[in-house]
From Swiss-Prot:
Outcome after substituting F4Y: No effect on PCNA-binding
Gene field: ALKBH2
Tissue expression as described in the entry: Detected in colon, small intestine, ovary, testis, prostate, skeletal muscle, heart, liver and urinary bladder.
Subunit structure: Interacts with PCNA homotrimer; this interaction is enhanced during the S-phase of the cell cycle. Interacts with nucleolar proteins NCL, UBTF and NPM1. Interacts with XRCC5-XRCC6 heterodimer.
Effect the entry attributes to changing A9V: Found in a patient with endometrial cancer; slightly decreased PCNA-binding
The protein, known as: DNA oxidative demethylase ALKBH2
Organism of derivation: Homo sapiens (Human)
Lineage: Eukaryota, Metazoa, Chordata, Craniata, Vertebrata
Gene3D superfamilies: Alpha-ketoglutarate-dependent dioxygenase AlkB-like
Similarity-based family: Belongs to the alkB family.
């Protein structure tokens, strides 16, 4: 499930690249670029069908990119949930907290954990594993997300960033275990961090074309819905931000297919 880690674990190269914008591209910031982002507060859920009552959504659109953003939890509730996550989530240790790149082992620049329904399996750094059973705080978040979106989720990947030096490199959530066409719900608690989308055709030193980067600051208690076909056309990352000193916990809720035996 974390095949993307291979690209992000080579010394300090990733950090240097993530702190720079590609030459000739102007980043589109949420609410700033009229063509790449559109602020449309609505009382409806993103995805399949509407919801009679719920938060106001900002819809982010670009070529092949379809996302919806809202602040799902007020500060007091978000603070409470964040403290529960800090106490209750059990993160990977040992070999599961490292990744092998070209025969060498590297520490993952963040903490990770997975929880989900019984019977599920997933691929993580070349290993096929089963998630831990749901705990109350995760069920609380999952059920609230489902209530406002109309979507169901059976798995969550949790990433904890101790400060702005922890990061994740450019990747796409395109693992074979994901239900085709299903959205991914990204919920954030703690420090606000920039979330960066880059089109697959505009990556590298010699991109085939120029497509504006889309950057979204993900606030404490926020929800970002990444709808199909976003992960087909766009890579995303959480770049290094050295001025950020506080921790952040991000949960990406997914719908995983049950492996046939």
């Amino acid at each position: 499930m974390d095949r993307f880690l291979v690209k992000g674990a080579q010394g300090g190269l990733l950090r240097k690249q993530e702190e720079q914008e590609p030459t000739g591209e102007e980043p589109a910031v949420l609410g700033g670029d009229k063509e790449s982002t559109r602020k449309r507060p609505r009382r409806e859920a993103p995805g399949n069908g509407g919801h009679s009552a719920g938060p106001s959504w900002r819809h982010i659109r670009a070529e092949g990119l379809d996302c919806s953003y809202t602040v799902l939890f007020g500060k007091a509730e978000a603070d409470e949930i964040f403290q529960e996550l800090e106490k209750e989530v059990e993160y990977f240790t040992g070999a599961l907290a490292r990744v092998q790149v070209f025969g060498k082992w590297h520490s993952v620049p963040r903490k990770q954990a997975t929880y989900g329904d019984a019977g599920l399996t997933y691929t993580f750094s070349g290993l096929t594993l089963s998630p831990k059973p749901w705990i109350p705080v995760l069920e609380r978040i999952r059920d609230h997300v489902s209530g406002v979106t109309g979507q169901t989720f059976n798995f969550v990947l949790i990433n904890r960033y101790k400060d702005g030096c922890d990061h994740i490199g450019e990747h796409r959530d395109d693992e074979r275990e994901l239900a085709p066409g299903s959205p991914i719900a990204s919920v954030s608690f703690g420090a606000c961090r920039d979330f960066v989308f880059r089109h697959k055709d505009s990556r590298g030193k010699s991109p085939s074309r120029r497509v504006a980067v889309v950057r979204l600051p993900l606030a404490h208690g926020s929800l970002l819905m990444m709808n199909h076909p976003t992960n087909t056309h766009w890579y995303h990352s959480l770049p290094v931000r050295k001025k950020v000193l506080a921790p952040r916990v991000n949960l990406t809720f997914r719908k995983i297919l049950l492996t046939k035996k």
